[in-house]
Each structure stands twice: as C-alpha cells, then as structure tokens.
C-alpha cells in the first residue's frame, strides 16, 4: 500500500514534525509541500534536519496543489483549514492540525475564535473512550490541541471512574515551540531563558473549552476546569499537573489500578512504575504520554501528572496515528515509541 500525502503549512514547526515522521513511515510517499508567506523557498531553509526533502520548493497553499493526494495534512493557523477542506473531495482523507473542527458547540467557537462555526470532525485522541471507533475509516479528522491531549489523558480515567469531583485544576508547563514559528517578543531568548511565566491566566487560554469538552465527556457530566499554562525555557514538551477533590476515601493503590486498567493496552500511553514521575525529556520525539498518579491524603485530592512532546504526540504524531486509523493501517505504523535523551 502506497499512500500519497500532502502537507500544507510545511514550513512551520508542526509541518516540519509531520514530515520528520512521514519520512519514516513505510507506506507513505510525500507529495506536495505548501506554505503561505514562505512559498517559493526551499524546505531546507526552514527545516535543515529534513535532508531528504531539503531541496523541495514550497508551493502556494491552494486546492489545486493539494488535490490528487490520498491524505492531506493541514498544519495551518485557525480559520484557514475549513475553506480548503471544503474544496477537497471525500476521496481524500483530510487531517486538520488546527483548531477549526475540534469544538462541538458553535457558541464555544464564536466565543473563543470568532466567526461561523466550521463544523465538528472526529476528534483525534484514540485513547479516550469511544473515539478510536469514530476515527477508524474517517475521511475527516480534527487533531486535538497539545494541552488538551496531555491534560485529558492525565485526568480522564479518574473522572470516568467517578473517583473525583467534576472540578479540575490543571497547571501545564510548556516549551516555546507551542506558540509557533512567528516572531514574538515574549519568545525571544533574552525573555525566556532563565525565567518562567504564566499566560492565558483565569480561563483565558483557547484550549480551555476543548479541555472542558473532553473531560465532561469522560466524566459523563459537566466538568469545570481551571487551566493555567506556564511558559518555560525549553523548546518543546509539556508537563501537566492535574488535581481534583476525591469523592470518597481512596488510596493511591486503588487509583493507580484505575489508570492501569484504562491504559494497559494502549501502545502510546505509559503509566510509569510507582514512584517514578514524568519528565518532558523522556518523551521528546516520541508519540508517547508518560503518566503518574497518586493521592494527597491531607488535601483529599487526586494528583496526576502527564508529560508529552507537544510537537509529536501533542500534534504531528497524533495526526499520523489518526491517519493510520483512517486508512486501516496498524495504529503504531511509522511512529516512534522511544524518546531522545538526554
């Protein structure tokens, strides 16, 4: 089986990570590579690590360039994917790495992104209950945001098992690549190095409604979420600490069993040995989530911690995982399980 693939937004971080993974995928042939303002330049000017594709010239992102492929990945800013996807036929699998098709509620879309709701596609966290079945054979897929990916997988089992109250606190430390490649003063090395800072405080981050949507589905009831992202001086990775009040006396061993039961058969989600806590460095370049969970007896709260590479399992790896499901390939095909360390 040979799958011809196009990547729109190939000059960005997500597009580059997609291409890194696709180069190692045994069933993929890489076709059109497109970009916006960087059209006309060679890919190697943006991703010198991608030597096999370095001399490929980036085309304009148009339907004509993207048509005729089996799979099209859209690694574009929010608001740009829907119009392009609408012009691609159902014979093409379209996988959107942006936000356009993640949210179910048009009101949420209008509040957080503005404009008309582009519609909802099957949502790309196969490890959450019921989602793998929707992704199998899908022709359209919405890749989740990086924060909702790790945070949802970190706390969802506790909500699904009824262990905790439906009020969750999430504090997630992230690297700078999550903000994309565009030049921003607060991401300059002089501003970031040697410092950590919060942003999107007080429920202001756009991933908040997506996280609420996921956790409410997992818990079977509305869940309130207080989400605070923290920018750290590292290029990639997210470490999410999620906590919620326990509904009854429960010890760490019982909680751990819930997580092991939830993820015991999942190839990409690893509940670490007892006493070992996740660290972002162990997930770099891998399509994996590392988890640990315990109980704070004095506070009466469950505390769960998850680590992920925001560019791999947090974006591009999830996109390839969903492509595999959509095409009926083994889910792990072409996806690394081993991170890069140190």
UniProtKB/Swiss-Prot annotation:
Pathway per the UniProt entry: Amino-acid biosynthesis; L-arginine biosynthesis; N(2)-acetyl-L-ornithine from L-glutamate: step 3/4
GO cellular component assignments: cytoplasm
Chief localisation class: cytoplasm
Keyword Ribonucleoprotein: no
EC main group: oxidoreductase
Known EC number: 1.2.1.38
One Pfam family, short name: Semialdhyde_dh
InterPro entries: AGPR_AS, AGPR_type-1, NAD(P)-bd_dom_sf, NAGSA_dehydrogenase, Semialdehyde_DH_NAD-bd
Keywords from the named record: Amino-acid biosynthesis, Arginine biosynthesis, Cytoplasm, NADP, Oxidoreductase
Compartments where found: Cytoplasm
Catalytic activity reported: N-acetyl-L-glutamate 5-semialdehyde + phosphate + NADP(+) = N-acetyl-L-glutamyl 5-phosphate + NADPH + H(+)
Entry annotation: catalytic residues: 146
Gene Ontology biological process terms in this record: L-arginine biosynthetic process
UniProt GO MF annotations: N-acetyl-gamma-glutamyl-phosphate reductase activity; NAD binding; NADP+ binding
SMART domains (UniProt xref): Semialdhyde_dh
PANTHER family in the record: N-ACETYL-GAMMA-GLUTAMYL-PHOSPHATE REDUCTASE, CHLOROPLASTIC-RELATED, N-ACETYL-GAMMA-GLUTAMYL-PHOSPHATE REDUCTASE, CHLOROPLASTIC-RELATED-RELATED
Family, as annotated: Belongs to the NAGSA dehydrogenase family. Type 1 subfamily.
Functional note: Catalyzes the NADPH-dependent reduction of N-acetyl-5-glutamyl phosphate to yield N-acetyl-L-glutamate 5-semialdehyde.
This protein's name: N-acetyl-gamma-glutamyl-phosphate reductase
Organism annotation: Saccharopolyspora erythraea (strain ATCC 11635 / DSM 40517 / JCM 4748 / NBRC 13426 / NCIMB 8594 / NRRL 2338)
Lineage: Bacteria, Bacillati, Actinomycetota, Actinomycetes, Pseudonocardiales
């Amino acid at each position: 089986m040979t799958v011809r693939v196009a990547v729109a937004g190939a000059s960005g971080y997500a597009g580059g990570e997609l291409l890194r993974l696709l180069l190692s995928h045994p069933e993929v042939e890489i076709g059109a590579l497109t970009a916006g303002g960087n059209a006309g330049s060679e890919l190697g000017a943006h991703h010198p690590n991608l030597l096999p594709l370095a001399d490929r010239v980036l085309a304009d992102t148009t339907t004509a360039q993207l048509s005729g492929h089996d799979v099209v990945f859209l690694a574009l800013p929010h608001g740009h994917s829907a119009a392009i996807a609408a012009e691609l036929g159902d014979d093409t699998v379209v996988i959107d790495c942006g936000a356009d098709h993640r949210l179910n509620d048009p009101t949420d879309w209008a509040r957080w992104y503005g404009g008309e709701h582009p519609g909802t596609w099957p949502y790309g966290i196969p490890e959450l209950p019921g989602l793998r079945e929707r992704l199998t054979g899908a022709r359209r897929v919405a890749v989740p945001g990086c924060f909702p990916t790790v945070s949802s997988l970190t706390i969802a089992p506790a909500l699904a098992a009824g262990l905790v109250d439906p009020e969750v606190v999430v504090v997630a430390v992230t690297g700078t690549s999550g903000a994309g490649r565009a030049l921003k003063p607060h991401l300059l090395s002089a501003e970031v190095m040697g410092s950590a800072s919060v942003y999107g405080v007080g429920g202001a981050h756009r991933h908040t409604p997506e996280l609420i949507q996921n956790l409410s589905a997992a818990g079977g009831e509305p869940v309130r979420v207080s989400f605070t992202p923290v920018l750290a001086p590292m290029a990639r990775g997210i470490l999410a600490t999620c906590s919620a009040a326990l509904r009854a006396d429960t010890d760490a061993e019982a909680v751990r069993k819930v997580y092991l039961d939830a993820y015991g058969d999942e190839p990409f989600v690893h509940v670490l040995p007892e006493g070992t806590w996740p660290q972002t460095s162990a997930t770099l370049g891998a399509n994996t989530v590392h988890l640990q969970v315990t109980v704070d007896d004095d506070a009466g709260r469950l505390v769960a911690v998850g680590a992920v590479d925001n560019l791999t399992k947090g974006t591009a790896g999830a996109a390839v995982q969903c492509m595999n499901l959509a095409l009926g390939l083994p889910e792990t095909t072409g996806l690394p399980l081993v991170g890069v360390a140190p």
